[in-house]
């Protein structure tokens, strides 16, 4: 029997990481950017507290979640959640069931991320879309292992290759700032994030979301399961 404490309780508790409006904004942005249709069936792998998943549902998608923690059911009991350890088990859904598979800050937590990526491919329908966010090792290497649960870092190149090896097509990987104003006005604010990243001392990160998320850059990958799989 596993007597370890729930990772959400330790790392993502509301004292250290209060609930905010950001997850709903992120879900809405991704729905708009990738033209995800209302009524599409989405699976979030590693949904944590369920905030982004709830954002997708509120945006009109049919959302399901899977995680090692039952925390989503505490915050959003109406959301269908399946609890399992994906380091050891398959995603507990049938082949080709979902139009969209989404994950954020997930694949870096696995010693063998190729296994979970293969499972994401399996549960996507042909033509379905994968969206995955993970820290950019090139700019986060100093802080990456501050999270004890991090296992495998990714660069844009290694993330792209992982998806291509697992038969995804139309693979795109780009740097992504977790700042909604940058999504809305990239030509104005993207250069300012770069200036902040290079000039602001790290000691100020806890005191400014702008400084923190100018420095803590994510990789955003999108990919498609081909209509005819090999």
Where are these regions (language model features)?
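Conserved N-terminal segment of class I S-adenosyl-L-methionine
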Residues: 1-94, 100-104, 117, 176, ...
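S-adenosyl-L-methionine-dependent methyltransferase catalytic module, highlighting the catalytic core
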Residues: 10-25, 51, 83, 111-123, ...
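A short His-aromatic
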Residues: 105-109
């Amino acid at each position: 029997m596993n007597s370890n404490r729930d990772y959400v309780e330790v790392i993502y508790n509301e004292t250290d990481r209060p609930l905010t409006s950001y997850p709903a904004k992120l879900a809405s942005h991704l729905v708009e950017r990738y033209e995800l249709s209302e009524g599409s069936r989405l699976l979030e792998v590693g949904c944590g507290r369920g905030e982004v998943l709830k954002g997708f549902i509120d945006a009109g998608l049919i959302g399901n979640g899977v995680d090692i923690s039952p925390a989503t059911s505490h915050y959003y009991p109406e959301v269908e959640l399946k609890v399992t350890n994906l380091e050891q088990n398959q995603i507990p859904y049938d082949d080709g069931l979902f139009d969209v598979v989404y994950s954020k800050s997930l694949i870096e937590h696995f010693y063998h991320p190729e296994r979970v990526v293969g499972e994401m491919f399996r549960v996507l329908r042909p033509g379905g879309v994968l969206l995955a966010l993970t820290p950019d090792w090139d700019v986060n290497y100093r802080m990456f292992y501050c999270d004890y649960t991090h296992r495998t870092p990714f660069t844009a190149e290694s993330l792209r290759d992982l998806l291509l090896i697992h038969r995804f097509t139309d693979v795109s990987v780009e740097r992504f700032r977790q700042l909604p104003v940058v999504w809305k006005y990239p030509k104005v604010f993207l250069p300012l994030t770069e200036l902040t990243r290079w000039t602001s001392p790290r000691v100020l990160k806890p005191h400014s979301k702008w400084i923190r998320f100018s420095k803590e850059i994510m990789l955003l990958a999108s990919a498609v399961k081909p209509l005819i799989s090999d």
